[in-house]
Amino acid sequence: YTGLTFDYAVTYLDAQYDKFTQGACYFGRTPTNATERTCDLSGETLPNAPEWRTNLGVQYEHALASGTGFFRTDWTYTSEQNSDTGLDPRAEQDAYNLWSARLGWRNGRYSVSLWGENLTDETVITAAGQQTVFGGIDGGMQFFLNEPRTYGVTMEVRF
């Protein structure tokens, strides 16, 4: 079909520490080096390193009398991962899907589009870290999350 474009990508990642004996210990994990209070993370999966990630995008463009109409949608799947450098189980992120879409019109000078990101309103841990208080007492976890469902209109004028 004229004006129809597909793009697809797959990533497989097997990322592990070969040797990392000075890793951070999460609260409740017994340090392997009691003097330095570090843990041996050798053989563990790296943080923020999902085994699988795949993207699929579809775009359709159609010539109109006054410009070009277009529609685009993107889908991303990411397998489970841990977002904490010490691999704290509280920072485990389950596999998730993200979906976005855009509908618009453009010509050489003007464009307008209606768009939406994270349309399924998926909550994803993007980073995490332990919070400790005096004496190494567990103060809980601090989580950073992705943006919730967002949508809007974008208008452009090119000079």
Q: What residue ranges belong to the model's regions?
A:
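Generic structural signal for short, flexible, solvent-exposed coil/loop and linker residues
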Residues: 35, 43, 85-88, 99, ...
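Gram-negative outer-membrane beta-barrel transporters
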Residues: 1-86, 154-158
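Residue-level preference for alpha-helix termini and adjacent loops
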Residues: 16, 40, 45, 51, ...
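Residues that define the transmembrane beta-barrel architecture of outer-membrane proteins
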Residues: 50-54, 95-99, 147-151
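C-terminal beta-signal and adjacent terminal beta-strands/loops
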Residues: 2, 76-84, 105-159
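Outer-membrane beta-barrel proteins
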Residues: 89-93
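Short, basic/aromatic-rich helical patch in the C-terminal catalytic core of site-specific tyrosine
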Residues: 101-103
